[in-house]
């Protein structure tokens, strides 16, 4: 529900987006077993941030569901979550971490770029609310 609350005001990120995210989380749980990790950030017993990594192969990891509640933005929590995910991927032997995002999230894309992710491709694809750009970014790990 954190995704639903955080994105509800953005055009194209309504209930269908929340259902799409719920579906991808269910797939992660069912298919991933112990091949990844989830981070949750709480403040006063309330969820204020999250992210996850799925180890997709021996060398590639996928960054998933980076989200920080509006009340906690601008304080470095997003950076801390993504940096923890990058460390985990690197320590797990991955030489590459990648993510998929879409348009309408310039703050997220700026954070990813600051942390060394580079744009690989942007192509139109059928997503939760019709055709949108699916943006692929990746970071090579040392």
Per-region residue spans from a language model:
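Conserved GNAT-fold acetyl-CoA-binding loop/helix
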Residues: 4-28
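A short helix-loop-beta-strand connector motif used in the catalytic cores of GNAT acetyltransferases and
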Residues: 28-40, 62
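Conserved beta-strand in the GNAT
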Residues: 40, 46-55, 62-67
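A short, internal acetyl-CoA/4′-phosphopantetheine-binding micro-motif in the GNAT/acyltransferase core
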Residues: 42, 66-73, 102
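Conserved acetyl-CoA-binding loop-helix of GNAT-fold acetyltransferases
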Residues: 68, 74-87, 110-114
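Conserved GNAT acetyl-CoA-binding A-motif
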Residues: 82, 88-101
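C-terminal "cap" of GNAT-fold acetyltransferases
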Residues: 95-142
């Amino acid at each position: 529900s954190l995704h639903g609350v955080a994105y509800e005001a953005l055009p194209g990120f309504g209930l269908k987006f929340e259902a799409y995210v719920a579906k991808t989380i269910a797939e992660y749980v069912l298919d991933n077993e112990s091949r990844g990790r989830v981070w949750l950030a709480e403040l006063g017993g309330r969820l204020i941030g999250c992210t996850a990594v799925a180890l997709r192969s021996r060398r590639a990891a996928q960054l998933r569901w980076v989200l920080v509640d509006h009340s906690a933005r601008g304080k470095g929590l997003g950076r801390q979550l993504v940096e923890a995910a990058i460390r985990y991927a690197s320590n797990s032997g991955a030489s590459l971490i990648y993510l998929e995002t879409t348009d309408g999230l310039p703050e997220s894309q700026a954070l990813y770029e600051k942390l060394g992710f580079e744009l690989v491709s942007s192509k139109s694809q059928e997503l939760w609310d019709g055709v949108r750009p699916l943006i692929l970014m990746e970071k090579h790990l040392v």
